[in-house]
């Protein structure tokens, strides 16, 4: 999904930015399909205006195929989040003037049965190095974008932000 993610980053990285909204990690019917955090297909294509090709990964879970922008399943949290921004800002360019939506962890994990496994549910031996790398990624993202606020979408994202961003001048809520 790199072409779509690159398009997203190019439109969403004003510096400094006022607010970064932070989720946990890609959902199977959102960013996994579209390359956009909380990437509800209708919002990505219609409101954000991204229509890039989405390739398949070398290894794909048979119960969670990557269909890209043709995915018919809905990312409910993404529909709500991008719907809120559409109502509040009207247009994607107006939103992206000083806002960004990101994920703490850019990776998706699927259990054997196809269920999404979030980073907080990984075994400690796997989670420790992953969380350290994601903490550094978040720190660098916030250092570069210099937002006034980081709005965490969920308790896990908030806890990681508080831990990772110690020493930076950013309000976390």
Give, region by region, the residue ranges found by the protein language model.
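A polyanion-binding, active-site-adjacent surface
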Residues: 1-149, 158-159
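Flexible loop residues that form catalytic
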Residues: 155
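Distinct, well-ordered alpha-helical segments
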Residues: 162-164
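Short, flexible loop segments at boundaries between secondary-structure elements
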Residues: 166-173
């Amino acid at each position: 999904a790199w072409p779509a993610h690159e398009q997203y980053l190019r439109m969403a990285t004003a510096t400094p930015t006022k607010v970064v909204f932070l989720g946990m990690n890609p959902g199977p019917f959102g960013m996994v399909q579209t390359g956009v955090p909380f990437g509800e297909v209708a919002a990505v294509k219609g409101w954000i205006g991204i229509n890039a090709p989405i390739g398949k990964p070398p290894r794909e879970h048979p119960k969670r195929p990557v269909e890209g922008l043709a995915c018919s399943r809905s990312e409910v949290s993404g529909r709500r989040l991008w719907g809120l921004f559409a109502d509040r800002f009207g247009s994607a360019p107006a939103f992206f003037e000083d806002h960004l939506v990101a994920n703490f962890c850019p990776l998706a994990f699927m259990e054997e049965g196809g269920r999404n496994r979030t980073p907080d549910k990984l075994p400690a031996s796997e989670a420790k190095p992953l969380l350290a790398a994601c903490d550094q990624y978040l720190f660098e993202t916030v250092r570069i974008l210099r937002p006034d606020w980081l709005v965490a979408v969920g308790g896990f994202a908030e806890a990681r932000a508080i831990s990772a961003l110690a020493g930076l001048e950013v309000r976390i809520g």
